Amino acid sequence: SNNIDWKKIVVAGHSQGAGHACYLGKKKLVERLIMFSGPNDYSTHFNSPANWLSDDGLTELSKQYALLHINDEIISYDFQILNLKDLGILTLSEEPLLVDNLSSPYNNKNALSLNIPAFSNHNATVGGNAKLPNIWTYLLTSE
């Protein structure tokens, strides 16, 4: 069969790929959606997140996760937070949970942030820091 059973698929992406994964999670009901250093679909021209971010999607919000770095040098952390608020992953008053010195289950939050030293903060969410495997396991398996 050529049919993809999307509800069995975990979709993830980094940077621009985080936006692609997010968009796919809007259009398909996936098992889980993980965004690393994104989504980055913020318009500085209109000073707002892209319209599609607030559209209804098929993947439950409880199955959507994000991992950001607070000192991202490529994409503004503040813009990424506004995007997560438009998605509904964060409430208007929430911030991603800083997890540098925490252990799983990270207060069962769906939006996490790092402030670990890295050569590239933007890439730190998918880099080689020893703290990341536990965070990734949480993103892939938390209920």
Residue ranges and their predicted role:
Residues 120-143:
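Alpha/beta-hydrolase-fold serine-hydrolase catalytic core, especially in secreted/extracellular enzymes
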Residues 19-20, 79, 134:
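Extracytoplasmic/secreted proteins, especially bacterial periplasmic and envelope-associated proteins
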Residues 12-23:
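Glycine-rich nucleophile elbow surrounding the catalytic serine of serine-hydrolase chemistry
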Residues 26:
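Short, well-ordered alpha-helices that flank and scaffold nucleotide-derived cofactor binding pockets
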Residues 3-4, 53-58, 141-142:
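Surface-exposed acidic, glycine-flexible loop patches that form ligand/cofactor-binding
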Residues 2-10, 14:
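Gly/Ser-rich "nucleophile elbow"/oxyanion-hole loop immediately N-terminal to the catalytic nucleophile
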Residues 31-127:
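The feature captures the conserved acid-bearing segment of alpha/beta-hydrolase catalytic domains
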Residues 1-2, 74:
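Accessory cap/linker subdomain of secreted extracellular hydrolases
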